[in-house]
Every structure is written in structure tokens, then in C-alpha cells.
Amino acid sequence: MSIDIRWLTYDDRNFALSLLNSTFSAANERFEDFQNTFPRIFSANAEKNISQHVGAFENGKLIGISAAYILNYHIGNDTLRICANGNIAVSRSARGKGVMSAMFEKIANDTSDKCDISYLHGKKARYRLFGYEECGAQYNISFTRHMLKDTAFVQYTFSDMRSNSYEQYTDELMAIYESKFDYIERAKDELVPALTSCGRIPICIFDEQRKICGYISYDSQNESIEEFGFKNYLDADKILKSFMNLIQTDISVRVCEYDKALLDYLIDISESYTVSAPALFKINNFENVIRICLKNKTEQIKNLPCGSLCIKSDMLKSPFKIEKNKDTVSVEFKPDTEKCDIELNGYELHRFLFGIHRQKYIGDERDLWFPLPLYIPY
């Protein structure tokens, strides 16, 4: 019997939850409840989010599932169109039948022209087979009570939005969220459920005058803040000190480099930091991704050298040329006859453009363009 691949509907919700819960419970050796862990996606009224999953069916039975959420990621005045893959599961009896390959083919065929980039979290060796490579950079910044001991103490109030009513504050929370330099476009009613994903605690922050001054999404198991927004990022030292005083432990914060002023400030008040790849990426639209990322770097780092660079790769339909002037960046594909400055094969292209530990490939000032910032806050 052939395997049927199609997008799910709300009628498939219970079957999807059953497959995900059983597959991940067995893999993680603990009970997993996707409805509670991912309320934005699997709550009883989240019909549109169920429909952003591809399912594999054999004899009418769901045997495989993979998410493909189409999202807009705003970075300054630019927008990256992204496809968030995840919730990938294949029933044990169906493994080895090409189910995962068929689902990824369906996702690629239906989303590649709609999205600049796709990403997921998982084992590099497994997902490289489908065009995903580990790259990009996230800063895991560690804060300690000792490091902030000289910071003035302010008594902030931290309210768990799972157990306290927050609807009256939704507009203020959204205003803080959308004032950030980079953020995923979300509907108002999706913000708090999104901050609750993966079992995290969505916390609303009030200052001493009981006015909202920010929010955090806190992972209590790993003692880390996975997402945050403050009205004034220069209050971060006081907010973090107050929060660590409340929970009586040191914490880490995950940050990107799109907003360099924020990143530099957090590093300056931190104990230490490490840099790692945030995800595995499959780039569908090299022109737009490179243009947005290099434009961002140009805006964040003054006096980045100007010039042009033509790159050839077996992963590209033809060579592409990057041109950077003082305030503008352009990226376009060129004919194969174009003389290229550098040729990169396979995933070396990703490491060249977005690799953390990147060697100097070019040997002149254009090396300062790279690595380009690439990050996903999800």
C-alpha cells in the first residue's frame, strides 16, 4: 500500500497528538504531553496551527508528522520569511520506509517559494540528508548574583502569566514585544502561549510603581531565559538581579547579534558567554538572506569595508555577486560566465557565510563581512 502525504486538518488533531506523545515519550524515556507543552499549537482552538503540519498516512492511519510553520521574522526594517520545521515523528512500525523523506519533499515543494529559509533542531548527520546544515550564532550569556552585587537593587514584581490573569495587559505586552529590534510576527492572542512553549514560564514584570516594564520566558529546568523584552534594555542589570534574588540561582540568557547595542550591553554586565549554532538551516533564497544579514551587519558595525564579491558553489543555480556600498547591499545571481572570486563546494558555503569559527577565505578586508549574523529566536 502506498503512503499518502498531505497537510493535516483539525480532524487529525487527536491522531497527531497521540503519535507525537508516544514517539517522544519513548525517545526521551519520560511522558510527553504536547498539548500542554505547546499550547499555542495544540490547544483545542488552535485549528490553523494543526493545519501547518504535514502527515504521512498508510491505510488511512497517521504514521508520520512534521511541522512547517510559515512565519515572518522582522529584523529592523527587513523581514525574513521562515519555515519552522519540528515536531517530527515517525511511528516505529513505519521506519525505514522513506516516510521522513516523503514528508520533507512535500514541505520543500509547497513552501520553498514562500520562505527564504527553513530551520529545525536535531542531529546534523540526520538532517543534512534533507539539505539542513548547522550554522548561525546565538550568544548564551551567563549572569551571576556575584557579578551584579554592586548593581542597585530594585524590587520588581514577577507574575506568572499561567496562573494570573494577563488579558488586561496584552496591549502593553505586545507594544514591548514589537518594539524589539527583531521579533517573530505573532497575533496578540498567541504571544503568551508562545512564551509558554517547551514548558517555559511566561512572566510579566512590573516595576515598583506596578507598571509593566517587560516580560521573560523562563526555562526553570535549565535556569535560562529563552526570550525576553524590556521597555528599556539598560534596566536589564536591575531586572536580572531582582529575578535572581527571587529564584535564588544564577541564570543564562539567549541572545542574537542583530541588535548589537543590546548584545554588547548584556555581555558587559555578564559573568561570561559562549557562542553556538542556534539551529540547522536550509536556505531557499540565498539572495534575500545574505542581503538582509549583511545589511544588518552594515548598520550595526560602522565603517564595514565596501566592495564586491562573486561566489560560485555547486549548491547554487549560478554564481551570485554581493555588492556593498556605504549604506546599501545588493545580492543577485550572475551568468556562469561571470568571473568569480571564490568557489565553495557543499556545505562549505554555509560555513563561509554563517559559520562561527570561520577561517579567512578571501585574504582582504571583505573577510570582515563574514560571518553574517543568522539566528532564530524559536
Where are these regions (language model features)?
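Short amphipathic alpha-helix that is part of the acyltransferase structural core
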Residues: 1-70, 77-80, 84, 148-188, ...
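Short hydrophobic/aromatic beta-strand element in the GNAT-like acyltransferase core
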Residues: 51-55, 65, 87, 200-204, ...
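A glycine-centered beta-loop-beta connector
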Residues: 57-61, 206-211, 365
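Conserved acetyl-CoA-binding loop-helix of GNAT-fold acetyltransferases
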Residues: 87-90, 96-109, 233-245
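Conserved GNAT acetyl-CoA-binding A-motif
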Residues: 104, 110-122, 247-258
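Glycine-rich, histidine-containing beta strand-loop boundary motifs that form or position
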Residues: 121-124, 130
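Active-site/acyl-donor-binding loops of N-acyltransferases
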Residues: 125, 133-150, 241-378
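Amide-forming acyltransferase catalytic core, primarily the GNAT-like/NAT-type
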Residues: 138-246, 256-258, 288-305
